[in-house]
């Protein structure tokens, strides 16, 4: 140094004397004591500058590389360790360039030097902030390992240091995996066994940051495959047996792509086939093209070559399919990369920072530039991770590192200016076109920026939640966008920076009671609620709240299990009222509510002036009547999701965004459902012939005082379009259950065509799926229809054998004068207008099997066995038209609006409510049913899906019976109404359907339909003769009948009139 630098009264020579004292110390402890004295000296002034300008660090480096004195090398390492440990952050800026010197000391012959080097490396690692690990430490270690002149003990130390980062800085490791994997993989094949073993251990540690649950079980085999290429084939087979359903991010790709690339270079056609399938499946699960930007270029050339040159046609086809998927992802990534405005903004901000600092600092520019580079790298890392915590940008980064150069006040100004510029740029880049900037002078409840993710999927990215007291917000967006997840996150206080429960109290209201079987009395259920007990809500207050929503004193003593879906929802609302929430979160509140109760709910919500409501509902009229504002899930330029705010109800929102018209018109939708044609029913030539009929049926639930159904007679044909209407608890769902055989009436009969297949979607539709949440939708259908019959039907309560049924099998029946015992029904064939069944008799070989008519079996009490056999035969007949293979199942799901990738790869547990309903609808249609029974089908479906379902039902040729409180849906589809009240059913004839609900039918189309309905087919000459002959036969039969038999008005049948 040419001039002395003053440090709190010390000249440069004094610093160098202390350095010499450190080097001359006789013991390790003495070295440490001198090191502490030196650290104290520098901490009193400006360590970022003085450590370098005094020559202290250069002196330590010279001592560390002194080949003649082991004492000096040990003292230098102790000096590094002690000074780093005592100075801490931000001194790492000037110490990081000396990391190679510290690592070199791991190869020293002296054990004490190696131990001191270990202390120095650990001290440096401990003082590094998280951002520096990614921006400086990992690149330094990779560069160090790539240096072929480095001795093997130092490389082992560097590998161990890298491996330790997986636990201390997992995010930094995950972000840098694309560069780490190739570096460590090369070291795994080093000729020095010590380096190879250390690299394998390091790789296992690094791979522990992978969070993909599909890949985690395979990590040991994947690492072993990297180390031992001969295990490649076994590894690929192991991967091919895995169903990938979790989101695939860059860290998982970093591990898999090197192995896939090597597999794509093999000659084995079987291995190539498996590899392209894995590649295709993985790429479909990459949510963001940026995640794959470092890997796609590596795979595309190999997959393209296989698509053109593979020997097997199947492999070429699979490779072509995978190439299409890769190209789509690559195109999206290229489009995003083409927009380099972010890089330009960062470069501009760093240039501005550099100019401002260099203009106002007296520190040598070489040193100042090294500190500025460090700060710029850290700022860029914060920006790329979307971290806009102003304190981190200014106090914890800008002021901390720049104040030694320009003073604290100016450093704060510079860093704040950079933060404001980049934050404003980020907001403009991620802004949503058309979002209304609401300025409301009312009490503000919540105003916070946040992001929302579900599993590995980003639903909302750096958006704003802005709520005012007394406003009622309708949250709208397509199925699966995350509406219910947002409400749950708010209810659980998991939204970033959301006010605490002491400031803002939230209450989530959903269908959580559905499907529960509890015998607790309704009043006890509410009074013993844990949340209400903590609020000291009295039993009388609970009773009053229940009474306010319609529960009489008598009803409050009934068990919860006796309530219909609508009454359970009202029970939830009563609990919410008692919690006195500031924010009421309503997820599909109108599901299962009848018209009267919906009107009550509308009146209640609009009367609450101090409660803010967030409502997710697919009932457009409800949102119109209740909402003061609309929150819309908006797509933006870079495919992130934001919340857009619009004043007014749904009608006002549609005026601003015409593309949202599907909220009003059923066919103004982008979603299309196509139902498979119904199967042929043997012996049914007319669409008006009854195929399912209930006669004088009555049903009472166990322990219930009143009949749910009382002497009901109804019938259905292939042309039926029936809506079952009535208040909550009237018995609508019970009517359906009795009609389709879910339960057996205590009085009366139910006739069902033996070959009739019924597709049934229950009110609690999810109960079909509750036992299969780990399966994908495709796997669920494969399970349900494996073996040639519908397992859901065979598992119904009405199909399970009771003790009485088992006793029935032990009874003998008389056939052809002989008493025999039925062992099984094994066949069926037509017998006149009925059927006869082949019986295997107990204790007799098959050659003694006989055919017994359906009527005899029913008279002898074998109804359940006959019905089960009919169900099996009809299901087998329907499944004869389909192959239970993944390709057909995928196409079937796509026909009902569920994307094929979700059907193949997503577990049912991860699906939204609307997607689960689509799974249930698709599953019940798989065996081509002739009758579709829908209990509340509109629940959980968004407007697009609702429109698609309505059009599919309209165009379907089978019979349909449904329960729905959605008047718009019912009036558009069902000309026949059955009104249920107090167990009685009143049929109201066929009224005209409201075709105005469908925009895709023009006036010309409607005239064609009308003409088609009225046009009668002209009979041929032979058909006229046959008609007259049948009439004469009927007349002769009447003449031969007993005296007094009433003469028919006509001898022609109804079909022949």
Curated annotation (Swiss-Prot):
This protein's name: mRNA export factor elf1
Residue ranges occupied by any ABC transporter domain in the UniProt entry: 440-659, 692-1019
UniProt-annotated binding residues for ATP 2: 726-733
Pfam families: ABC_tran (PF00005), Chromo (PF00385), HEAT_EF3_GNC1 (PF24984), HEAT_EF3_N (PF24987)
Residues the record lists as Phosphoserine modifications: 733, 1041, 1053
InterPro entries cross-referenced by the UniProt entry: AAA+_ATPase, ABC_transporter-like_ATP-bd, ABC_transporter-like_CS, ABCF_EF3_subfamily, ARM-like, ARM-type_fold, Chromo/chromo_shadow_dom, Chromo_domain
SUPFAM superfamilies with a match to the protein in the record: ARM repeat, P-loop containing nucleoside triphosphate hydrolases
Annotated segments matching region Disordered: 1020-1057
Subcellular location: Cytoplasm; Nucleus
Lineage, highest ranks first: Eukaryota, Fungi, Dikarya, Ascomycota, Taphrinomycotina
GO molecular function: ATP binding; ATP hydrolysis activity
Example of a GO cellular component annotation carried by this entry: nucleus
Keyword line: ATP-binding, Cytoplasm, mRNA transport, Nucleotide-binding, Nucleus, Phosphoprotein, Repeat, Transport
Basic and acidic residues composition bias: residue spans: 1020-1036
SMART domains found in the cross-reference section: AAA, CHROMO
GO biological process, one term: poly(A)+ mRNA export from nucleus
Effect on the protein of changing residue 731 to D: No mRNA transport
Task of the protein: Has a direct role in the mRNA export process. Appears to act within the rae1 mediated mRNA export pathway.
Positions of ATP 1 binding: 477-484
Domain Chromo: from-to ranges: 820-869
Main location (coarse class): cytoplasm
């Amino acid at each position: 140094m040419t001039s002395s630098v003053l440090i709190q009264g010390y000249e440069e020579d004094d610093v160098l004397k202390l350095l010499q004292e450190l080097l001359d110390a006789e013991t390790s402890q003495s070295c440490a004591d001198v090191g502490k004295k030196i650290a104290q000296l520098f901490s009193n002034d400006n360590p970022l500058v003085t450590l370098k300008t005094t020559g202290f660090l250069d002196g330590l480096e010279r001592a560390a590389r002194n080949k003649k004195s082991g004492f000096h090398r040990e003292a230098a390492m102790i000096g590094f360790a002690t000074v780093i440990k005592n100075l801490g952050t931000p001194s790492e800026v000037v110490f990081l360039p000396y990391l190679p010197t510290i690592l070199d000391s791991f190869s020293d012959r002296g054990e004490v030097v190696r131990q001191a080097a270990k202390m120095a490396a650990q001290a440096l690692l401990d003082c590094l902030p998280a951002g520096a690990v990614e921006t400086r430490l990992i690149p330094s270690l990779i560069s160090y390992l790539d240096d072929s002149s480095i001795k093997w003990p130092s490389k082992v130390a560097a590998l161990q240091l890298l491996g330790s980062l997986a636990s201390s800085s997992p995010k930094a490791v995950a972000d840098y995996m694309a560069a780490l994997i190739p570096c460590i993989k090369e070291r795994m094949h080093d000729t020095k066994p010590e380096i190879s073993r250390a690299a394998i251990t390091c790789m296992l540690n690094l791979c522990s940051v992978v969070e993909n649950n599909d890949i985690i079980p395979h990590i040991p085999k994947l690492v072993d495959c990297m180390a031992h290429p001969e295990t490649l084939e076994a590894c690929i087979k192991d991967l091919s047996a895995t169903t990938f359903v979790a989101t695939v991010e860059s860290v998982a790709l970093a591990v898999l792509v090197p192995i896939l690339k090597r597999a794509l270079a093999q000659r084995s056609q079987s291995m190539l086939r498996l590899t392209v399938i894995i590649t295709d499946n993985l790429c479909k699960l990459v949510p963001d093209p940026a995640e794959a930007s470092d890997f796609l270029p590596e795979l595309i050339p190999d997959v393209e070559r296989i698509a053109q040159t593979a020997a097997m046609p199947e492999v070429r086809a699979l490779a072509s399919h995978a190439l299409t998927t890769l190209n789509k992802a690559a195109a999206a990534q290229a489009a995003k990369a083409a927009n380099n405005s972010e890089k330009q903004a960062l470069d501009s901000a760093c240039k501005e920072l550099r100019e401002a600092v260099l203009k106002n600092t007296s520190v040598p520019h070489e040193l100042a530039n090294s500190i500025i580079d460090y700060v710029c790298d850290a700022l860029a890392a914060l920006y790329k991770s979307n971290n806009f915590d102003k304190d981190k940008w200014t106090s914890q980064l800008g002021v901390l590192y720049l104040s030694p150069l320009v003073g604290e006040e100016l450093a704060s100004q510079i860093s704040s200016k950079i933060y404001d510029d980049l934050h404003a740029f980020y907001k403009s880049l991620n802004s949503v076109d058309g979002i209304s900037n609401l300025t409301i002078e009312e009490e503000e409840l919540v105003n916070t920026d946040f992001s929302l993710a579900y599993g590995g999927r980003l639903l909302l990215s750096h958006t704003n939640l802005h709520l005012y007291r007394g406003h009622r917000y309708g949250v709208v967006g397509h199925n699966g966008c995350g509406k219910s997840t947002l409400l749950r996150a708010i209810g659980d206080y998991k939204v970033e920076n959301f006010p605490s429960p002491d400031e803002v109290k939230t209450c989530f209201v959903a269908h959580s009671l559905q499907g529960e079987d509890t015998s607790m009395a309704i009043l006890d259920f509410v009074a013993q609620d844990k949340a209400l007990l903590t609020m000291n809500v009295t039993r009388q207050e609970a009773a009053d709240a229940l009474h306010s929503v319609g529960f009489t004193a008598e009803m409050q003593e009934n068990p919860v299990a006796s309530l219909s879906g609508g009454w359970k929802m009202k029970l939830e609302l009563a609990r919410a009222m008692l919690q006195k929430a500031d924010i009421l979160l309503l997820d599909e509140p109108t599901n299962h509510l009848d018209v009267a109760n919906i009107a009550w709910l509308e009146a209640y919500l609009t009367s609450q002036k101090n409660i803010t409501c967030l409502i997710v509902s697919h009932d457009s009229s409800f949102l119109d009547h209740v909402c003061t504002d609309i929150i819309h899930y908006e797509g933006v330029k870079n495919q992130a999701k934001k919340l857009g705010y619009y004043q007014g109800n749904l009608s006002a929102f549609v005026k601003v965004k015409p593309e949202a018209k599907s909220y009003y018109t059923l066919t103004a939708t982008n979603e299309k459902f196509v139902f498979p044609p119904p199967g042929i029913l043997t012996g049914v030539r007319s669409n008006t012939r009854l195929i399912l009929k209930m006669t004088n049926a009555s049903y009472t639930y166990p322990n219930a005082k009143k009949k749910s159904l009382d002497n009901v007679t109804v019938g259905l044909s292939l042309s039926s379009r029936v809506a079952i209407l009535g208040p909550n608890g009237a018995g609508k769902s019970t009517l359906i259950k009795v009609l389709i055989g879910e339960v057996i009436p205590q009085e009366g009969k139910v006739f069902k065509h033996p070959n009739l297949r019924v597709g049934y979607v229950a009110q609690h539709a999810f109960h079909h799926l509750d036992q299969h949440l780990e399966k994908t939708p495709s796997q669920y259908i494969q399970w349900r229809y494996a073996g040639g019959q519908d397992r859901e039907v065979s598992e119904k309560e009405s199909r399970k054998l009771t003790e009485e049924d088992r006793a029935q099998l032990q009874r003998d029946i008389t056939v052809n004068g002989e008493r025999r015992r039925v062992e099984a029904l094994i066949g069926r064939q037509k017998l006149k207008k009925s059927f006869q069944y082949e019986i295997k008799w107990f204790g007799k070989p098959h050659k003694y099997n006989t055919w017994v008519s359906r009527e005899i079996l029913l008279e002898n009490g074998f109804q359940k066995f006959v019905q089960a056999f009919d169900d099996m035969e009809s299901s087998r007949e329907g499944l004869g038209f389909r192959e239970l293979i993944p390709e057909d199942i995928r196409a079937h799901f796509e026909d009902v609006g569920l994307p094929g990738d979700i059907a193949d790869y997503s577990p049912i547990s991860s699906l939204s409510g609307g997607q689960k309903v689509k799974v249930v609808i698709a599953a019940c249609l798989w065996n081509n049913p002739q009758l579709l029974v829908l209990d509340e089908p509109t629940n959980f479906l968004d407007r697009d899906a609702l429109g698609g379902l309505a059009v599919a039902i309209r165009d379907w040729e089978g019979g349909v019976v449904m329960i729905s409180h959605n008047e718009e849906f019912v009036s558009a589809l069902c000309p026949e109404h059955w009104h249920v009240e107090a167990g009685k059913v009143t049929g109201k004839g066929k009224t005209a359907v409201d075709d105005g609900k469908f925009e895709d039918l023009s006036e010309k189309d409607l005239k064609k339909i009308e003409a088609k309905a009225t046009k009668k087919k002209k009979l041929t000459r032979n058909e006229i003769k046959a008609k007259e002959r049948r009439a004469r036969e009927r007349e002769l039969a009447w003449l031969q009948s007993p005296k007094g038999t009433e003469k028919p008005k006509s001898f022609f049948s109804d079909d022949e009139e």
